[in-house]
Amino acid sequence: MKNYNQVYVENSLEAAQHYCRAFGAEITRAFLNADGTAYEHCELSVNGEGFLALAEAKNPCDVALVHRMKWETMTFNVFEMGSEEAVRHAFGVLSEGGMVLQPPGPLPWNPFNATVIDKYGVCWWIAK
């Protein structure tokens, strides 16, 4: 059995590239809508392993409201990233246009981590 998450976002073509840049991922499967302007389904992999799926949201959320309210209804946890530099890199990309909830640093349960709601309204906890 395998499990990974899927996000529904506005601007799915841009979001896929954004997440590839943040995590060193690559698009391994992609199905565009009829006019080629959005993903009906897209899968990202890191080192050959499925990491994240995404698709264009049919009813996108108000990301500005998510940022203003600092909503954390669900968090995607990416951990064992291998180094503080990997966490800093992902944090730098994910925080572009996003809302930082916790900057990179230690917590009692992890020596180096951060939490950010990205510009698509997705909350990420990233850790070494």
Name what the model sees in each region.
Residues 1-10, 17-117, 126-128:
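Vicinal oxygen chelate
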Residues 120:
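Active-site His/Glu-centered metal-binding helix of metallohydrolases
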